[in-house]
């Protein structure tokens, strides 16, 4: 931590350059002369901790100006995207936040502006800080001080002892009442503690144990936003494990609680279902970090570039896929002839994901992405078994790419993590890697356009055969595509002949 001097109770001094960001000059230029602006929260905390500025930059401001107008003018000046975020709840002290988001890859900036009201400026600031979540986030500096030339003695406002707590490695709630007023702060506390390597204080844990469901009093959109911020962490598995152990995750997603019902997963697993699930997420984060070791640069070209829910990506969705990949197992658990089975748990799981996504208001795009991962998470293992037997055919590989090509890198990474968390033998993991390599090679060299769709469409088939719409048309299209994949049909003329030959055997299926 930087060298901080104590001025008086609740005040310290620190060199202003510690807090500087070039965009602060732009804020100052659109701030009306008669108004003030303070930098608060995580930006101040991280600079005091001496952390480097990363690619994801979040800054919170308190201002005596109209935050909406200030944010609008700031967004216009820097070319950012402006929006207003409304917090719900009668106890929320800052219900309206004006935000500006700017993406300059690889950097992502978010600036939030909240109102500061009161005749006595310093008193209003101190009162606001005392209403915040954790002492580490209840620290502020004046924007003017940060921008002053040679600001060696910038005053740092710290009425709740946040700096002392940071020095001791603690993350302490400003008060339990503040957590009760805005319970989504519970999720934030677990995340920040892991992210910043801080120890949450005992009063926080006692509060959570007393009522893990209190988080549900917050708006579902804010819960979802905080959960996705957790998944954005490189070590999200640590936060998720704590949320699970303290009952918070189950309160939000009751389906997660059912995982502990399955103690025995059968011969292919070394952990109970809940531990296997948490381990899969843990291994996945390692695999994501080392992804270039497992997949080609070509396949990874667009990995992490799909945007969802504003500031999040397909990487977070992949982590949700890991957490939910076996969510259908409790409902499909059975013992048949002495063997544990989970028939169609992938299909059941995909439907459960859709229900969760709708409840947490993920939106269709994010929900369907995760549902598709869950629905097809077994595909790489089926293909591995075919590969081990020497039965991996063109048709199977082509079907995979045609049906799962958009999520292929995600499925591959998930399958590797799933195998590790299942305790697969080294030779089986090696076979999985070889299967993935074979699939990649096929996609790169042989997955031509003509085997991704039939050479004849439905209208053409009906015209050739002189038939009306019916099941036979779909059956013939599928048979034609499989013949193309197998290399038996390569031209349109061959396709016509194939359809004519196939009609005699298939025609009875269209009757009745």
Swiss-Prot record:
GO biological process: tRNA 3'-terminal CCA addition; tRNA surveillance
Organism: Aquifex aeolicus (strain VF5)
Binding site for CTP: 42-45, 132-133, 137, 182-191, 222
Family: Belongs to the tRNA nucleotidyltransferase/poly(A) polymerase family.
Listed result of changing residue 60 to A: Loss of activity
General function of this protein: tRNA nucleotidyltransferase involved in the synthesis of the tRNA CCA terminus. Adds the two cytidine residues to tRNA.
Phenotype for residue 182 to A: Does not affect CMP incorporation
Binding, Mg(2+): 58, 60
Phenotypic consequence of residue 132 to A: Strong decrease in CMP incorporation
Keywords for this protein: Magnesium, Metal-binding, Nucleotide-binding, Nucleotidyltransferase, RNA-binding, Transferase, tRNA processing, tRNA-binding
Catalytic reactions of this protein: a tRNA precursor + 2 CTP = a tRNA with a 3' CC end + 2 diphosphate
GO molecular function: CC tRNA cytidylyltransferase activity; CCACCA tRNA nucleotidyltransferase activity; metal ion binding; nucleotide binding; tRNA binding
UniProt remark on domains: Adopts a seahorse-like shape and consists of four domains: head, neck, body, and tail.
SUPFAM superfamilies named among the record's database cross-references: Nucleotidyltransferase (SSF81301), Poly A polymerase C-terminal region-like (SSF81891)
Cofactor(s) the protein needs: Mg(2+)
Effect of substituting residue 377 to A: Does not affect CMP incorporation
EC number: 2.7.7.-
Protein name: CC-adding tRNA nucleotidyltransferase
Listed result of changing residue 363 to Y: Reduces the CMP incorporation at position 74 of the tRNA, but does not affect the CMP incorporation at position 75
Transmembrane feature ranges: none
């Amino acid at each position: 931590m930087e060298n901080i001097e104590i001025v008086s109770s609740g005040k310290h001094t620190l060199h202003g350059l510690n807090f500087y960001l070039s965009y602060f000059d732009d804020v100052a230029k659109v701030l009306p002369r008669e108004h003030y602006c303070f930098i608060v929260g995580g930006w101040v905390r991280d600079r005091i901790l001496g952390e480097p500025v990363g690619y994801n930059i979040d800054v919170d401001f308190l201002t005596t100006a109209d935050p909406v107008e200030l944010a609008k003018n700031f967004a216009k000046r820097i070319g950012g995207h402006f929006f207003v975020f409304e917090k719900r709840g009668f106890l929320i002290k800052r219900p309206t936040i004006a935000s500006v988001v700017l993406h300059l890859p690889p950097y992502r900036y978010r600036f939030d502006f909240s109102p500061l009201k009161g005749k006595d400026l310093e008193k209003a600031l101190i009162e606001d800080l005392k209403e915040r979540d954790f002492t580490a986030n209840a620290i502020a500096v004046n924007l003017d001080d940060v921008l002053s030339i040679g600001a060696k003695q910038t005053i740092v406002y710290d009425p709740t002892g946040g700096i002392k707590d940071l020095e001791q490695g603690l993350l302490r709630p400003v008060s339990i009442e503040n957590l009760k007023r805005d319970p989504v702060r519970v999720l934030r506390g677990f995340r920040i503690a892991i992210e910043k390597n801080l120890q949450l204080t005992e009063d926080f844990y006692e509060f959570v144990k007393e009522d893990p469901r209190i988080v549900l009093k917050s708006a579902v959109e804010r819960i979802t936003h905080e959960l996705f911020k957790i998944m954005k962490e490189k070590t999200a598995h640590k936060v998720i494990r704590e949320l699970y152990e303290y009952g918070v995750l189950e309160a939000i997603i009751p389906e997660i609680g059912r995982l502990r019902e399955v103690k025995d997963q059968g011969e292919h697993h070394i952990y109970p279902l809940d531990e296997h699930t948490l381990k899969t997420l843990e291994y996945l984060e390692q695999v994501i970090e080392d992804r270039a070791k497992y997949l080609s640069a070509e396949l990874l070209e667009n990995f992490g570039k799909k945007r969802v829910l504003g500031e999040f990506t397909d990487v977070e969705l992949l982590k949700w896929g890991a957490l939910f990949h076996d969510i259908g197992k409790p409902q499909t658990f059975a013992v048949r002839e002495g063997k544990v089975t989970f028939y169609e748990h992938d299909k059941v799981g995909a439907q459960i994901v859709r229900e969760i996504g709708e409840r947490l208001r993920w939106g269709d795009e994010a929900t369907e992405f995760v549902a598709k991962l869950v629905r097809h998470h077994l595909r790489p293992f089926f293909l591995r078994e075919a590969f081990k037997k020497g039965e991996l055919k063109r048709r199977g590989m082509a079907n995979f790419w045609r049906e799962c090509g958009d999520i292929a890198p995600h499925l591959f990474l998930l399958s590797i993590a799933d195998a590790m968390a299942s305790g697969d033998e080294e030779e089986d993991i090696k076979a999985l890697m070889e299967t993935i390599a074979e699939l990649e090679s096929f996609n790169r060299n042989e997955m031509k356009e003509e085997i991704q769709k039939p050479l004849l469409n439905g209208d053409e088939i009906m015209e050739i055969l002189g038939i009306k719409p019916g099941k036979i048309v779909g059956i013939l299209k599928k048979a034609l595509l499989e013949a193309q994949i197998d290399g038996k049909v390569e031209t349109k003329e061959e396709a016509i002949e194939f359809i004519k030959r196939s009609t005699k055997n298939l025609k009875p299926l269209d009757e009745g």
